[in-house]
A protein has these predicted regions:
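Flavin-dependent oxidoreductase catalytic cores
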Residues: 1-224
Length: 224
């Protein structure tokens, strides 16, 4: 597949994802939270050894992708409430060890993934992060979305700007921006009647604060 893409003088990145806490595999997450609509269902919290294994799996996947001819990696990631998003957001990260608490601790797993990929694949191997710039959620669980963005309980744009600056300082080569969460799927998977390019106002604000490339998802239907 990568050979076919390269034949047209194009580049191809592999998107590496881990959705734990948003699926039923082992019912494990960053902290003990309810991953489903039923608040009586609780996940178990990953131990530090289990977190290290998850990080190693990201790194091994990147190594395999490079062997397969992919030109870089998108860590998928810090949006929609997936594993790294659960680390990054205080509403889902209640840990008291080095992976919880302050913002830099909540980003530690994302940093360790990057460091590992760069160590194994080379410092010049591109690694970008996919990140939701605003969660549009008032709480956890089905029906907790906020169309107007008020009473935000997830990630705000202001916090995303701080995260973007930290990701750049860690060595990430770019950020793919979108908005929304499983609690606010209207934004995460915007329907056809949402304005095209509706994420651009958010990504434009982030771009003012970093020098790495900013990519944008969300109703970017027309390249012209």
């Amino acid at each position: 597949m990568t050979d076919r893409v390269h034949a047209y003088d194009c580049k191809m990145l592999a998107q590496i994802a881990m959705g734990n806490g948003r699926n039923g595999v082992g019912l494990k997450s960053v902290s003990e939270v309810a991953p489903f609509w039923d608040p009586s269902v609780k996940t178990g919290a990953y131990t530090k050894d289990e977190i290290k294994r998850k990080i190693d799996q990201f790194i091994k996947a990147a190594v395999n992708a490079k062997k397969g001819g992919f030109d870089g990696i998108e860590v998928h990631a810090m949006h929609w409430g997936y594993l790294l998003d659960q680390f990054a957001m205080s509403i889902t990260n209640h840990r008291t060890d080095e992976y919880g608490g302050c913002l830099e601790n909540r980003l530690r797993a994302s940093r360790e993934i990057l460091d590992g990929i760069k160590a194994e694949c080379g410092s010049d191997y591109p690694v970008i992060m996919k990140m939701g710039l605003k969660s549009f959620m008032t709480g956890l669980g089905y029906g907790q979305g906020s169309l107007d963005g008020e009473d935000e309980k997830g990630r705000t744009l202001e916090e995303s700007i701080e995260i973007a600056k930290l990701l750049e300082s860690y060595g990430y080569d770019g950020i793919t921006c979108n908005v929304g969460n499983y609690e606010s799927m209207f934004y995460a998977c915007a329907p056809m009647y949402v304005n095209k390019g509706f994420v651009l106002p958010f990504s434009t604000e982030v771009k003012k604060h970093v020098n790495i490339p900013i990519l944008v998802a969300g109703r970017m239907n027309d390249p012209y």
